[in-house]
């Protein structure tokens, strides 16, 4: 087994180390990454190819073999050595062939199409191709796949893949999502009544006469933040951010707390939310509804007319929101000067928001233009439209105000000497950044190859691409080159926001970390430091799982959506932009569907194959990255969510701006440093505020 060295808990021999961690598998491409249990010792993810999974499944706790002689610049690639424990007790299988009435071959999404498995079927039912089944996870064997595993045991019939209503039960099972709350949790939540708000008034600041209000989407049910704006005697802004005081109701080690700690966050699907807290709290007592008294944590921040922070106060309060405003209503006031009782306040808020945005730009932070959409579903859960998420002035206003509150809270707690969960985002590594710069160069953009840590890098990216048709595509590629934001008790700063201090505080209804931050503000001894380390790891992990579940649900719905197009409009041509061209083929983006596609070289003109063998620089302009092409849907397979395309014709290349002027970064004296079927519709807003990706 080998000896422990320097307290590192891994097994060692001459050639490799065995590192424990959690496996995350790409549901369609088959490869995975292992996130080590000890990030302080292994501050990187380990890549696992599909052929090296050795029977391990998404979510498994594994031991991965990593070459011991790995040098600094080498890719961290490992092989699964052992499955320590299964991450899931059940799998979802889809029947691809029937052997006999009680035995079938099934496709399991987390294993891949190359390895269909046998499954024993429950009696007293007639099965057909496409039936979705709930199966018991097999025991891991060390000799996998040298010996055929025994048939999987069927637990439950879900429905046929042709029925769109089966998609959600499948996602729930695949990602171990619990929708219903235990009786003890529901009972505990229901014991709180409006009278508890009145009873708490004597120990809080009474802000019920303050003009504050919420700004959310028209479909929102949980309102966890309200805003206010007043002025001091010198004319400085006093911005108030008022957050629902969830910690008053969800106390340490209560049934509510234990359940919230399991879930870590709410999960958002098109038309459906799996909340972190029962509706008695999330949609009622903790929701800052208009004209009712609510418990809150209020942060008052004083800013100069130039937008720099000079003072702040944090207190527990009782507020009474005066209005429930929607993004659309606020935009009408800002852009069209629509008359409203609070229009003057909103216009001043918009003014302050623009000042904050300018300061962000001065310190080198840019607002990335990223394509985003919401899937609209009908009563049968069939997709009927893709609705573009438009980032409006109202969205930017709330985003800027929440960023300020999160920054101030992080600064305040950390300067009390209290260990806390930071929201950290490290700069891209050099290798990833070079790949991005090569992609940009291939598209015709020249971005100065300065270190990503320099404050002007993001600004240069914005200046180089601003207003160009390829802007959202290139910005998406830049985001992919960056590391994923996560939670940590070590303050590493936030690269994407260019901030020295940052945490999550503004959404305790839907994020457990925010709830912990609230406790640290007023009862820091209630959070044990050792327990906090476990919390940040669990919340980072659950955040990734939630994102994968949300993405998997959207993928199957998008496949259904495009399948309708190929059935009803098979000859339709779609405009696309080439992202990369390689000997393997071309990848491209279809803005109309916010979708990335790929055409293998075998299905491209023979000239393409010959030219890529000579060198990519020999490709004609109309087949190089950045070129505009026309593609046609060839096939859609619901089982694997595989979408195939055909290149129909090439048109012209979108001309990129080759140079940009470097804007001088102004010094900031305060800590102001461092989201037929109908086609896509415009003008819709996001259904949830602040995705939490920052």
Curated annotation (Swiss-Prot):
Region described as Disordered: spans on this chain? 652-694
Identify one Pfam family in the record: OB_RNB
Looking at the record's lineage, which domain of life comes first?
Bacteria
All copies of the S1 motif domain together span: 571-648
Q: Name one GO molecular function term.
A: exoribonuclease II activity
GO terms of biological process kind: mRNA catabolic process
Question: What are the transmembrane regions?
Answer: none
Q: Name one GO cellular component term.
A: cytosol
- Biased composition (Basic residues) is annotated at 654-664, 672-694
For this protein, the Enzyme Commission number is: 3.1.13.1
Database matches in InterPro entries: CSD (IPR011129), NA-bd_OB-fold (IPR012340), RNase_B_OB_dom (IPR013223), RNase_II/R (IPR001900), RNase_II/R_CS (IPR022966), RNase_II/RNase_R (IPR004476), RNase_R (IPR011805), RNR_Ribonuclease (IPR050180)
* Domain RNB: start-end pairs: 204-525
Q: Where in the cell is it found?
A: Cytoplasm
For this UniProt record, give its keywords in alphabetical order, as a comma-separated list: Cytoplasm, Exonuclease, Hydrolase, Nuclease, RNA-binding
Q: What is its main location?
A: cytoplasm
Q: Which SMART domains match?
A: CSP, RNB
* Swiss-Prot/TrEMBL catalytic activity: Exonucleolytic cleavage in the 3'- to 5'-direction to yield nucleoside 5'-phosphates
Q: What does this protein do?
A: 3'-5' exoribonuclease that releases 5'-nucleoside monophosphates and is involved in maturation of structured RNAs.
Membership in a protein family: Belongs to the RNR ribonuclease family. RNase R subfamily.
Protein name from the UniProt record: Ribonuclease R
């Amino acid at each position: 087994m080998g000896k422990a060295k320097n307290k590192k808990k891994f097994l060692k021999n001459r050639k490799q180390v065995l590192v424990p961690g959690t496996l995350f598998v790409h549901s369609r491409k088959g490869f995975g990454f292992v996130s080590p249990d000890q990030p302080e010792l292994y501050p990187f993810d380990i890549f696992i190819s599909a052929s090296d999974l050795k029977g391990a499944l998404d979510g498994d706790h594994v031991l991965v073999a990593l070459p011991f002689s790995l040098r600094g610049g080498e890719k961290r690639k490992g092989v699964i050595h052992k499955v320590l424990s299964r991450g899931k007790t059940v799998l979802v299988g889809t029947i691809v062939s029937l052997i006999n009435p009680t035995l079938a071959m099934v496709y399991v999404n987390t294993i891949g199409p190359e390895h269909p498995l046998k499954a024993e079927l429950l009696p007293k039912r007639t099965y057909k191709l496409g039936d979705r089944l709930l199966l018991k996870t097999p025991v891991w064997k060390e000799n996998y796949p040298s010996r055929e595993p025994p048939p999987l045991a069927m637990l439950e019939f879900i429905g046929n893949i042709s029925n769109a209503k089966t998609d959600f039960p499948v996602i729930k099972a695949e990602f171990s999502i619990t929708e219903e709350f235990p009786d003890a949790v529901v009972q505990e939540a229901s014991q709180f009544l409006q009278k508890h708000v009145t009873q708490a008034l004597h120990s809080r600041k009474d802000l019920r006469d303050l003009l504050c209000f919420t700004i959310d989407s028209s479909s929102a049910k949980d309102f966890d933040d309200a805003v206010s704006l007043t002025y001091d005697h010198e004319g400085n802004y006093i911005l108030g951010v008022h957050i629902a005081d969830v910690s008053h109701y969800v106390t340490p080690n209560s049934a509510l707390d234990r359940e919230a700690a399991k879930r870590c966050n709410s999960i958002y699907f098109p038309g459906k939310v799996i909340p972190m807290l029962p509706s008695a709290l999330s949609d009622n007592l903790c929701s800052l509804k208009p004209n009712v008294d609510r418990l809150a944590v209020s942060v008052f921040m004083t800013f100069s007319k130039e937008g720099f922070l000079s003072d702040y106060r944090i207190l527990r309060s009782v507020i009474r929101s005066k209005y429930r405003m929607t993004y659309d209503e606020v935009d009408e006031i800002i852009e069209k000067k629509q008359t409203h009782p609070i229009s003057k306040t909103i216009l001043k808020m918009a003014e302050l928001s623009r000042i904050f945005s300018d300061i962000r730009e001065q310190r080198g932070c840019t607002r990335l233009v990223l394509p985003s959409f919401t899937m609209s579903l009908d009563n049968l859960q069939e997709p009927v439209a893709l609705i573009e998420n438009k980032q409006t002035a109202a969205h930017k206003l709330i985003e800027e105000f929440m960023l300020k509150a999160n920054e101030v809270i992080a600064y305040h707690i950390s300067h009390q000497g209290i260990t806390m969960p930071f929201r950290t985002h490290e700069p891209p590594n050099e290798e990833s950044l070079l790949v991005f710069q090569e992609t940009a160069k291939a598209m015709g953009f020249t971005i100065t190859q300065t270190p990503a840590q320099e404050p002007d890098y993001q600004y240069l990216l914005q200046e180089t691409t601003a207003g160009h048709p390829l802007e959202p595509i290139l910005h998406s590629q830049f985001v992919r080159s960056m590391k994923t934001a996560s939670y940590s008790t070590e303050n590493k700063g936030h690269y994407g926001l260019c901030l020295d201090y940052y945490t999550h505080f503004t959404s305790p209804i839907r994020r457990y970390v925010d709830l912990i931050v609230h406790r640290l503000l007023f009862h820091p001894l209630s959070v044990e430091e050792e327990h906090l380390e476990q919390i940040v790891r669990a919340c980072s992990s659950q955040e990734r799982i939630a994102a994968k579940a949300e993405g998997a649900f959207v993928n199957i719905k998008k496949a259904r959506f495009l399948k309708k197009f190929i059935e009803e409009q098979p000859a339709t041509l779609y405009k696309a932009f080439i992202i990369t061209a390689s000997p393997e083929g071309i990848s491209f983006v279809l803005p109309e569907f916010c979708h990335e596609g790929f055409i293998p070289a075998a299905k491209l003109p023979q000239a393409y194959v010959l030219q890529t063998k000579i060198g990519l620089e020999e490709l004609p302009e109309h087949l190089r990255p950045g070129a505009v092409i026309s593609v046609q849907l060839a096939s859609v397979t619901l089982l694997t969510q595989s979408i195939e395309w055909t290149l129909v014709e090439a048109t012209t290349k979108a001309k990129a701006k080759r140079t940009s002027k470097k804007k001088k970064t102004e010094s900031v004296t305060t800590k102001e440093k461092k989201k037929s079927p109908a086609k896509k519709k415009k003008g819709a807003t996001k259904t949830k505020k602040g995705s939490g990706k920052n």
